[in-house]
């Protein structure tokens, strides 16, 4: 392979990671370079401390300037249900019940329950108890939105276009009033 072809790939790998955190497979896909080539450049950048990596369920690559909490946030949002819960609660002006989240996100009750549990453990959401149900809301919207801007800039930029109009989940709670 010519040096001319290697250079763009090498620079692209670094640029993508410094721009925002990413997973290894997403990086390979976005750079459109061979897996082995990306791996080679990653090892060079990690050795130089130009980038960092965190291995877990996914191999996350990120800028050394990002705080650990932002990386945890990114990892958490790799789960589509957790991401959906967080986005719906960020957008909502009201605290929502689990039933409302199930109706809005169209995921199963156990999936929503698991996502809520993880978000509660991280203290990114808080639970409000009302007999016979609980509602959930974001603990610190400003802080979470700042982390969203660092990890998912496209979502943060287009956040105002995200609409919660459908379905109207409030009908599920009318029986308790």
Q: Could you tell me what each predicted segment is?
A:
Residues 33-44, 106-121:
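Short amphipathic alpha-helical interaction segments
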Residues 1, 25, 29-71:
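Long, low-complexity, charged/polar intrinsically disordered regions in eukaryotic proteins
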Residues 21, 50, 93-94, 124:
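Residue-level recognition of short, well-ordered coil/turn positions
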Residues 1-16, 62-66, 73-88, 92, ...:
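Long, low-complexity, charge-rich intrinsically disordered regions
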Residues 19-31, 94-105:
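Short acidic, hydrophobic short linear motifs in intrinsically disordered regions
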Residues 21, 57-59, 133-135:
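A generic structural signal for beta-strand entry/edge sites
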